[in-house]
C-alpha cells in the first residue's frame, strides 16, 4: 500500500562529518554500516515486526560519495562525500580534455566535482591506497555489499558519479582512460526492482534481518525522492523543498543540451532498452 508501518532513526543527530582541510568533507563508511545495523535492530524490536515478515530491502543514500574497498569489503579510506570540493580542478581539466561535445553527448554532464573526479584525486594523491582498491562503490552500494557480501552497483549510481557513457550504454572508456581508472574496479551492474542479492548469514547476524531476504532497490536520495513523489515516466515533473530545493523532470530523450544548466542522471528505473533520465 505504500503506507509506512514503522520508522527508526540512528543516530538521533546527524552523522559527524570530518573536514581536515578547507573544502574537504569525509565520513567513514563503517559508521554508516554500524548505524544501519543499530537502526534495523531498533526497528525490529520496537515495532514487533518479525524479520521473516520483511519481503525485500531498498536503500536510499547520499549521492556522489566515493567508497573504495579491499577484497574483504573493508573501506580503504574515509568516503569523500558529496559536499567535498577538492576534486573540482580534476573535473574542469577532464571537461577541457574530453571536450564539451563528448561530455554533452555521452556523459550528459560535465565531470565536475562528481565521484569520478574524486577518484582521480585519490589516484593522484594516494596512489598506494588506490593500488590496494578492489572495487569502487557509492554509499548505498557499500551498505548493500555489507548486507549481502557481494559488491554491486547500478546504472543510476554510475551515472551520478559521471562514470556512465549513455550513448554506448557502458562505463565511459574515454573518461576512465583520461583519469587512468582501472575498469575492473567497477562492480557487477544490476537493475533496480529485481533481486540484486540477498542478505548473507553475516548480514543477518549483524542487523537482525533474515538470511536470504532479497535486496531489490538502491538509489541516491534525489532520484529516490523523484520516484517516491511520482516521477516515473517521461513528462513527469515534481519538486521537493528542504535543506535544498530541487525540481525533477523526466525525459526519455538522450540529450545533454542543458549541460551548463541542469544535472542529468539515469533515473532509478533506467534500463538500456527503456531509457529514463
Please place each PLM-identified region on the residue numbering:
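Short glycine/proline- and acidic residue-enriched helix-loop micro-motifs
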Residues: 21-26, 100-109, 272
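Glycine-rich phosphate-binding loop of actin/hexokinase-like ATP-binding domains
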Residues: 66-71, 75-93, 133, 137-172, ...
Amino acid at each position: 500500500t505504500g503506507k509506512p508501518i514503522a520508522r527508526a532513526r540512528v543516530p538521533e543527530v546527524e552523522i559527524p562529518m570530518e573536514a581536515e582541510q578547507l573544502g574537504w568533507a569525509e565520513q567513514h563508511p563503517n559508521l554508516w554500516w554500524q548505524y544501519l545495523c543499530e537502526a534495523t535492530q531498533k526497528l525490529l524490536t520496537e515495532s514487533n515486526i518479525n524479520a521473516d515478515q520483511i519481503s525485500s530491502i531498498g536503500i536510499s543514500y547520499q549521492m556522489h560519495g566515493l567508497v573504495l574497498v579491499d577484497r574483504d569489503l573493508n573501506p580503504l579510506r574515509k568516503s569523500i562525500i558529496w559536499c567535498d570540493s577538492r576534486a573540482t580542478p580534476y573535473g574542469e581539466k577532464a571537461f577541457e580534455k574530453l571536450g564539451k561535445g563528448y561530455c554533452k553527448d555521452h556523459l550528459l554532464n560535465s565531470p565536475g566535482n562528481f565521484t569520478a573526479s574524486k577518484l582521480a584525486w585519490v589516484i593522484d594523491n594516494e596512489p598506494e591506497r588506490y593500488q590496494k582498491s578492489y572495487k569502487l562503490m557509492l554509499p548505498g552500494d557499500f551498505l548493500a555489499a555489507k548486507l549481502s557480501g557481494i559488491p554491486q552497483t547500478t546504472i543510476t549510481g554510475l551515472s551520478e558519479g559521471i562514470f556512465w557513457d549513455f550513448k554506448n550504454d557502458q562505463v565511459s572508456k574515454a573518461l576512465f582512460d583520461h583519469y587512468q581508472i582501472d575498469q575492473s574496479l567497477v562492480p557487477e551492474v544490476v537493475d533496480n526492482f529485481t533481486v540484486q542479492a540477498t542478505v548473507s548469514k553475516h548480514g543477518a547476524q549483524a542487523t537482525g534481518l533474515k538470511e536470504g531476504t532479497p535486496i531489490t532497490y538502491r538509489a541516491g536520495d534525489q532520484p529516490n525522492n523523484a520516484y517516491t513523489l511520482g516521477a516515473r515516466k517521461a513528462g513527469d515533473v515534481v519538486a521537493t523543498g528542504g535543506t535544498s530545493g530541487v525540481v525533477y523532470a523526466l525525459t526519455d530523450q538522450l540529450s545533454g543540451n542543458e549541460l551548463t544548466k541542469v544535472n542529468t542522471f539515469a533515473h532509478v528505473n533506467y534500463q538500456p532498452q527503456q531509457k529514463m533520465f
